[in-house]
């Protein structure tokens, strides 16, 4: 999620300061260094997704897990963003990475694919760790009793939209800000979304789904799977459109497909 992205998470943002030193390197060493930097970013995304899903299991394993899990997830995400925002940009979420791909031309398609792959693999490994903690596979967040899938979709779309919109405004709309502003804002949005019954992260749902398949648990709510898997992407799309509609002209950013000159 973070500075969400945007310095370390983009293709060139985390490397601008080292251009002079890199000019003196041989091409082979320069490429190797570039590879190492990218692998560090991907590993941060993998590790963070793993820890987030594990935090879900740790929260649910406690008595009163329905109340403990949101707090466990929120505190974990706050810490991870603080630790990794200057390395990978702290996306931790495929929906976030897709939004950054739309808003930062330095974040390439290769970056997007590698980030999403790392997040999905991390979520899957975390789900198997959750299996070890719980003694059974984690369940995909079920639909609320008596609520249709289309209504439950709002529980995913709205919190995700608010979270990503807030981060876009903070990161692209302001200059200097307190270092912990983004972790606090993202943590607050995640906490509110978790209590509202939202997953907000397709990597979590994907990992739990794979762990259920591998443990031969066929009792999967397909409607809940689709809502929690694709709802965050819809929320990310609305967040992107909302930011373009309200801020992109007055606080111009180098969008991939649009160019706002600003006032």
Curated annotation (Swiss-Prot):
SUPFAM superfamilies: Aquaporin-like. GO terms for cellular component: vacuolar membrane. It is found in: Vacuole membrane. It is a multi-pass membrane protein. Keywords: Membrane, Repeat, Transmembrane, Transmembrane helix, Transport, Vacuole. It comes from the Eukaryota. The chain crosses the membrane at residues 41-61, 64-84, 113-133, 157-177, 180-200, 222-242. It catalyses: H2O(in) = H2O(out); glycerol(in) = glycerol(out); urea(in) = urea(out). InterPro entries: Aquaporin-like, Aquaporin_transptr, MIP. GO terms for biological process: glycerol transmembrane transport; polyol transmembrane transport; urea transmembrane transport; water transport. Aquaporins contain two tandem repeats each containing three membrane-spanning domains and a pore-forming loop with the signature motif Asn-Pro-Ala (NPA). Belongs to the MIP/aquaporin (TC 1.A.8) family. Mediates water and glycerol transport across cell membranes. Permeable to selected sugar alcohols of up to five carbons and urea. Permeable to methylamine/methylammonium. Can transport hydroxyurea, an antineoplastic agent with inhibitory effects on parasite proliferation. This is Aquaglyceroporin. It comes from Toxoplasma gondii (strain ATCC 50611 / Me49).
């Amino acid at each position: 999620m973070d500075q969400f992205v945007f310095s370390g998470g983009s293709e060139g943002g985390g490397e601008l300061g080292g251009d002079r030193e890199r000019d003196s390197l041989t091409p082979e060493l320069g490429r190797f260094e570039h590879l190492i930097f990218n692998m560090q970013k991907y590993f941060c995304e993998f590790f963070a997704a793993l820890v987030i899903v594990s935090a879900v299991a740790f929260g649910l394993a406690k008595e009163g897990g329905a109340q403990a899990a949101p707090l466990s997830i929120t505190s974990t995400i706050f810490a991870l963003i603080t630790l990794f925002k200057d390395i990978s940009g702290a996306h931790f979420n495929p929906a976030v990475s897709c939004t950054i791909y739309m808003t930062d031309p330095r974040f390439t398609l290769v970056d997007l694919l590698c980030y999403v792959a790392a997040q999905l693999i991390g979520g899957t490994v975390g789900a198997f760790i959750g299996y070890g903690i719980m003694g059974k596979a984690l369940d995909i967040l079920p639909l609320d009793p008596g609520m249709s899938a289309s209504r439950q979709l709002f529980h995913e779309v709205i919190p995700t939209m608010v979270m990503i919109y807030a981060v876009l405004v903070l990161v692209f709309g302001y200059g200097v800000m307190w270092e912990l502003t983004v972790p606090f804002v993202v943590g607050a949005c995640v906490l509110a979304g978790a209590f509202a019954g939202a997953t907000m992260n397709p990597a979590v749902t994907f990992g739990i789904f794979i762990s259920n398949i591998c443990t031969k648990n066929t009792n999967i709510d397909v409607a809940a799977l689709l809502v929690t898997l694709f709802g965050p992407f819809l929320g990310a799309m609305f967040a992107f459109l909302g930011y373009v509609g309200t801020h992109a002209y007055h606080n111009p950013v180098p969008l991939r497909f649009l160019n706002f000159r600003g006032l």
